[in-house]
């Protein structure tokens, strides 16, 4: 009996979790944060990834092919990677605020819109932001809702 109740509660919780999920298309950073991130990127990342984010023979581009690589994940996955593996010559040295700003710049450079709230500098806060390669189609309002 308890298992049935627990299973029922878990099934009911899934739609609630999906409804609370935000997309990068909802504006996961601010313009000002992306601007700070661009400066930090030029100082700490451009020598490997290029000033135009095109990458080199040895490093991947951070535009174009970058999007499908991260698509289907949540933003904490990208943020954790940037925070722990970059810059290559001194991984994890930039700190959470700088890494959040650089991630915001990467989103802007890839055409994702800015919002009114800064991209969080903790992984936990980013677990509900999905990295959708394509803008989700808005749900149509039903005739009754009008």
PLM ranges: what are they?
Residues 9-18:
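Hydrophobic h-region of N-terminal signal peptides that target proteins for export
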Residues 21-22, 91-146:
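Flexible coil segments in periplasmic/lumen-exposed cytochrome c-class electron-transfer proteins
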């Amino acid at each position: 009996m308890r298992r049935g109740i627990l299973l029922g509660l878990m099934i009911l919780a899934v739609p609630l979790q999906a409804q609370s999920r935000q997309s990068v298309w909802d504006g996961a950073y601010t313009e000002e944060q992306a601007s700070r991130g661009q400066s930090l990127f030029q100082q700490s990342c451009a020598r490997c990834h290029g000033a135009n984010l095109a990458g080199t023979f040895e490093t991947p581009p951070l535009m174009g092919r970058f999007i499908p690589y991260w698509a289907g994940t949540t933003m904490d996955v990208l943020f954790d990677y940037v925070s722990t593996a970059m810059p290559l010559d001194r991984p994890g040295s930039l700190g959470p605020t700088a890494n959040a700003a650089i991630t915001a710049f990467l989103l802007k450079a890839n055409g994702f819109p800015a919002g009114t709230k800064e991209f969080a500098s903790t992984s936990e806060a980013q677990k509900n932001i999905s990295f959708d390669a394509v803008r989700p189609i808005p749900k149509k309002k039903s005739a009754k809702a009008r």
